[in-house]
Amino acid sequence: MEQQQSKNNAHVSKLFICTAVDCKDDIEEKFERSFVTLQMQISGLSDKEMHDMLSQAVCKEKQHEEISIGFLYIMLTDPSMASKTYRDVTLVSRDGMNGIVTNLTFLVAEKYTKLTEVARRQLIWLLREFVKHQVLSVENVIWNCLRQAGGGDVSSRNLFLIESLLDIFIEFRTWLETNPFLVQSTVYSFVRLIEDHANPALLSLRQKEVKFTISLIRERFHDIIPLGRDFVRLLQNVARIPEFEQLWRDILFNPKMLHQTFNGIWQLLHIRTSRRFLQCRLLPEMERKISFLASSVKFGNQKRYQDWFQDKYFATPESHSLRSDLIRFIINVIHPTNDMLCSDIIPRWAIIGWLISSCTNPIASANAKLSLFYDWLFFDPAKDNIMNIEPGILVMYHSIRNHPFVSSTLLDFLCRITKNFFVKHEDKIRIGVYNSLKLILEKQVIPNLQPLFESPKLDRELRNLIRDNFREFLSPPANHGQLLFTSLHPVQGHILKKESDQRILHCENMDLHETGLINISGTIDEDKKILLVPTDQEIESVFSDETAENLRRVHNIEDNTDDDDDLPLSEVRLKEKPKVELAEAIAESFDAFVTKRNSYTWEAFLKDFRPLPASAFEEFQLNYVISNTVLILRETLPQQNIFSESKTEEKHLAKSISYPLYGLFRFLYENDEKSKKPFQTLLSEICEGIPEIGYLLLYFMKIYCKLQTRKNSQQSYQFKTTIYRQICDAADEKIGNCLLRDLDLLEKENTNIFLWLLPDIYREFKSIATNNTDLLRITLRCIDAKNVRDILYSIAQGKLTIFKQDGLIDCIRQSLEFETYEQFCLWQIVQAHDVPLRCIQDILPELEAGSHPEALSHFLLLLKNEEPTNEIIRLMLSRESKSKGDPFVTSALRFWCQRYEEKLSEIIASLLTSKYPSSSPNKRKRPPKGISVSTSTPSADQVLNHLEHYRRSCRHGTGTGLYVHDMMQRALQSAYSHSNDSTKKQFCDLFALAAEEDTTVGRRGGSGRGRKQPGSKKDVNNHGTSKKNPEMVKTIYSSDDNSSEEDWSKSKILQTAKRRKKANNDSD
């Protein structure tokens, strides 16, 4: 008994609400374990002892995470200790609290509903602290909190979260406006939430929301424009609020007042709203449930799941507004794969039909129907996705037989919305609806519209309305089945999805009273609308097992059938295509391939098809063969896990290349002879219909060669780049462009496979891949530390060569625009290739300290291992020197001075001397042996600038030996004598380091060459041998702010130089 009691007590959590039947999951265990571990570590310690102990402990990755989670647990469960704990965690965190933010984001997304009341309030406090101190990535936590602020929910718990977030946004408005995506999400969410807060008891909250949202929309309208058409749909639901009514007037009347780039309402309506904004209006838990329903529940078994969903989320009157959010999410976000479309999983149209037919609120029902047909109104076949209009036609088509009330309601709504949604631009709306219906027929989503539009189950008034609106679709259509054979391009089913980009169209300003832009929630005509609310018995029978079975039966079109559309689309198309007679040589093998759809029958057909000349086919026959083969090859490819789970096990490797498309690659690998024109045409159409063919071929050759080599170790199997070239020729693209595009697609699809293939790519496509900046960028953007390590291993073992010396500098020059992490990885790879400095040193003058810190850091490390040479010094001193100097050049000179002081001094002196004419007309100065004078040497001012900034870096005499050598002394004296007054004044402290020479030097004699005050030419001639006191020169030209340290350094240098000269004279 005591044991049971202790077990129950152990399960009590301060962070999560736990019922008697709940068990701790891994997340809860992790948080509580980290809290207990932290308490054991810091118990009884003073603040200083705790900080010292934790500072050492966080150096280990695992302990750092445990400590971070432990602190997070305390801040969420103990309000009295929260402030002190926040201070402690800022002191010991070594990742800018990134670990805490990451765990908090996960906690909000996955466990918010289970948090205790105290934890929810502390969460808001912690968010406020994070925003106040601008902690990185806090916007991710905010976005997930916005998702938890559910629509259709006016419970006190939900209202607390909404108002708390609103207060944070108002208080930290400046921070909010720095993140455009968060601005967009906030506006989209609050416009949606305002709709639910019409209760007079919520008037104060609603006014606060309206004031904040309107202000944010007007001041940040350029960020609001990308919200697109669904933002307009939400604005319609709040159009009766005075502030939003005025906003509507500005949008329609005076769009330029909102933003200079805004051209009116049509610009918004032709921008597809991003999936993320549609997603943010569903609770994460609700999203998981509806996604499970659409991906894992079999058609016919869905009723119990729908009943649970109804009781959970549609229990209150306010919750009916959620139906529109769900329908928009299902239509735009849940796009089933080919495998799912061909399976018995409940289709999207059935879920949407249930959401609409079970709605008992007239306004919510009208809004739900608008959500279903919203994309129809602005549909552009060239840019929009057919998956967004498919559910609308299918729910009507499948319901007309057993549930005509659903089809009648939706058809009536479609007819009326086409005419009344935007009266002034009815023609544009009608074009969008016509485009939708036309593409639906062309893509064979349904065979034809007659069973729907001319059904005897529709009342006469509705049939007349349909006839008035869709007259073009009522006459018997042309043989749409033949469309498949009239073009060389195969018809891609609507299952081949592609995302549409944002579109912007322009329109004139519209008069508010003439536009006819209807407000669904405010202008419903109760007398005219057709709203058939089914009985409970009808609701239970909607899309039941019996209906599902009936929908699968095959009937003739004259029998008013709608059942074919529940079959996989590919089977429907094949069944409805007219039989085409083919040449005897391929008829049998083609039929076998169409029936069995496997690699064996496919390769047998290719063997028969390849040698056939163009004369063996009529055009419609070739089109028939091509369209069917492309469709089957596409549909037989798996949508997920297309690559092998293992890179070593033969079973997994062989299975991953067992699909028919790989049969084509195998056939090409084993047959090198030239193909006839029909086969080339087939190959070209396959390339167009399956964009992934390029990287799948590369993957196939890697696996195939690996497996064949294992089977027959006596024979070597290698990549055949000729096959890839054949694919590129079929696609009519250059091999370099094809390779980059395919590798880019592969990296986005599966980074591990991309990196696995990388050594083979660089080996087999050496001329294209080596020093290729685009390929390098694709590689660098996806690698982490472990990947960099593996790449370095491959380079060290000679398996991978990414760079060659010739042309590498151009590659590095282009990489200067890469992200910081990418550049650091790049320099590690360059270093692994043992590239000599001479191959890349010419870029040194181009590097800027502010723009290229990564490259300069690496060059500095390279220079530490090199001796100074004339060429390197010339390039370094050619760098532009800013007012504060060039720390890169100064650093290099400092560490070279420690080992190569005399050599460095001579090289720089030679460069400086070469900028001035010879002092004696009868003598010609020559640089020391081994030092050549380049035509692209730095200017005298550049050299003097760098020497001056180097001098300033010297303190207490350290590093000043550079100036005491004879050549440097003579160079500085020569520079001084040939400089104008402004230059002498600018570098007076530098020139002061040059010691004056005695009148005679050694045995040769001659006039002494000393530094002189600036004077006229006459003065120079008359006093050529006079000596000037260095201190006097210094007094005339030095600046007033020289420090005592600099004076001490210069004095020491002068003394050293004089001693060296005296020693030289004595030796002479």
Swiss-Prot record:
Domain of life: Eukaryota
UniProt entry tagged with the keyword Phosphoprotein: yes
Record localization: Nucleus; Cytoplasm
Alphabetically ordered keywords of this record: Cytoplasm, Nucleus, Phosphoprotein
Family statement drawn from the similarity comment of this UniProt entry: Belongs to the Integrator subunit 3 family.
Subunit structure: Belongs to the multiprotein complex Integrator, at least composed of IntS1, IntS2, IntS3, IntS4, omd/IntS5, IntS6, defl/IntS7, IntS8, IntS9, IntS10, IntS11, IntS12, asun/IntS13, IntS14 and IntS15. The core complex associates with protein phosphatase 2A subunits mts/PP2A and Pp2A-29B, to form the Integrator-PP2A (INTAC) complex.
Function: Component of the integrator complex, a multiprotein complex that terminates RNA polymerase II (Pol II) transcription in the promoter-proximal region of genes. The integrator complex provides a quality checkpoint during transcription elongation by driving premature transcription termination of transcripts that are unfavorably configured for transcriptional elongation: the complex terminates transcription by (1) catalyzing dephosphorylation of the C-terminal domain (CTD) of Pol II subunit Polr2A/Rbp1 and Spt5, and (2) degrading the exiting nascent RNA transcript via endonuclease activity.
Name the record gives this protein: Integrator complex subunit 3
